[in-house]
Amino acid sequence: MKRVLFFQVLFLFIFTTAQAQIKKSPDYETAKAEAIKEKKDILIVLTGSEWCKPCVKMKKNVFENQEFVDYANEHFVIFEVNLPRHWDMNSKVYQDYSFFKEKYQTNALPSLVLLDSNEKLKAVISEKLTLFDKTMEKLKELK
């Protein structure tokens, strides 16, 4: 009986403390289709979350903040291009990174590219992305 009660309490604890995750599209084509269907903007995240120090800080301070997660999931379709420390120039992730970097003229990591559902550029944000308040303020201002 004690064992059953223990597992019930453990199960309840796990599910009440679990935080929602940012919903990410697996590829850009899917992100575009979802944005049109859901009438949301597209947020392209250019990052190197394993090795880029500002990217690591952005992930910790912004993308792991529950307020940001909730806001982002409600307002954006997110497509992340996360460059690994050792990338191959022929890889899909590197090709995506190169394409978006050139198209939206940003060399900064991290960068956020905000598009409307028709892919019209709203903004490229590459400053103060490690600061939760500044990032939220900018995204809400552009919404």
Language-model segments: what does each one mean?
Residues 1-23:
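Bacterial Sec-dependent N-terminal signal peptides
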Residues 23-25, 68-94:
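Thiol-based oxidoreductase modules, predominantly thioredoxin-like and allied folds used
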Residues 24-42, 72:
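A short beta-strand-turn-helix
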Residues 38-52:
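Short active-site neighborhood of thiol/selenol oxidoreductases, capturing the structured segment around
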Residues 43-44, 78, 112:
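Hydrophobic beta-strand anchors of alpha/beta hydrolase catalytic cores
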Residues 52-55, 112:
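The canonical Cys-X-X-Cys-His
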Residues 55-71:
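Typically the conserved alpha-helix immediately C-terminal to a functionally engaged Cys/Sec
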Residues 102-143:
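Non-catalytic, surface beta->alpha helical segment in thiol-disulfide oxidoreductase systems
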